[in-house]
């Protein structure tokens, strides 16, 4: 091969490489952390109050035993349910897209299920009426658009909340005993304690955070915690009347 031919071959190779799309190099994902814990109730648990649903026989017949209020629900081992736990400080400068999966608020037995719902701002909320009777769902926000919608059985209803707000009281204008709460966040780092008081904040970026626990009757508590990359830590809150 002559020098001229060799130069032509090298030029052709370089030209073909220059026409290739650039290779994208992805940096390895940062190891995330988790924060698990439990919320406890100190002292003798308050007795739940029986709900009188006699004004709507369709509501009353949905329960084999009398329905009770859910403002303070204490489970096994004094675990406190329906507490919202969330990152209230430490995420400055970060933005998060809402999940594609909608949150679901069900009206069942003429009560809101779950009693306390948490979702992300601009995440779709599917409101479901599983009862034979007609409901009127009416959130009363301070930082979001108020809406007040009559919903017969089976009629689909989709809503969203645009801004963070903890927490929005929800009532039903038809059934005055129906009460619940919706907590709206601008990030995905929140949880609602289960029937045993347990919660799990997953996939936290490493950092130092203020963690807040909110309960509708017992108020709020805060703690500060630092988690490293890939680290798992535990946290406990205790409420009392």
What are these language model-derived features?
Residues 1-5:
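Positively charged n-region of N-terminal signal peptides that target proteins for export
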Residues 6-20:
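Bacterial N-terminal signal peptides
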Residues 25-241:
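Extracytoplasmic copper-binding redox domains, predominantly the cupredoxin/blue-copper superfamily
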């Amino acid at each position: 091969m002559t020098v001229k031919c060799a130069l032509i071959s090298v030029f052709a190779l370089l030209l073909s490489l220059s026409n290739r799309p650039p290779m994208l190099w992805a940096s390895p994902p940062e190891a995330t952390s988790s924060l698990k814990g439990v919320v406890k109730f100190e002292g003798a648990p308050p007795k739940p109050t029986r709900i009188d649903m006699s004004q709507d026989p369709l509501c009353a017949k949905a329960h084999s035993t009398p329905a009770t209020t859910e403002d303070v629900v204490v489970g096994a081992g004094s675990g406190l349910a329906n507490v919202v736990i969330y990152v209230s400080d430490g995420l400055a400068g970060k933005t998060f897209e809402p999940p594609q999966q909608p949150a679901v608020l069900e009206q069942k037995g003429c009560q809101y299920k779950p009693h306390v719902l948490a979702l992300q701002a601009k995440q779709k909320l599917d409101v479901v009426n599983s009862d034979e009777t007609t409901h009127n769902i009416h959130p009363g926000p301070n930082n979001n658009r108020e809406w007040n919608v009559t919903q017969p059985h089976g009629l689909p209803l989709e809503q969203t909340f645009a801004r963070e707000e903890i927490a929005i009281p929800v009532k039903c204008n038809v059934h005055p005993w129906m009460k619940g709460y919706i907590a709206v966040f601008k990030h995905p780092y929140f949880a609602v304690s289960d029937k045993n008081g347990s919660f799990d904040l997953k996939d936290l970026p490493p950092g130092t955070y203020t963690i807040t626990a909110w309960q509708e009757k017992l108020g709020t508590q805060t703690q500060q915690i630092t988690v490293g990359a890939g680290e798992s830590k535990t946290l406990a809150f205790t409420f009392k009347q």
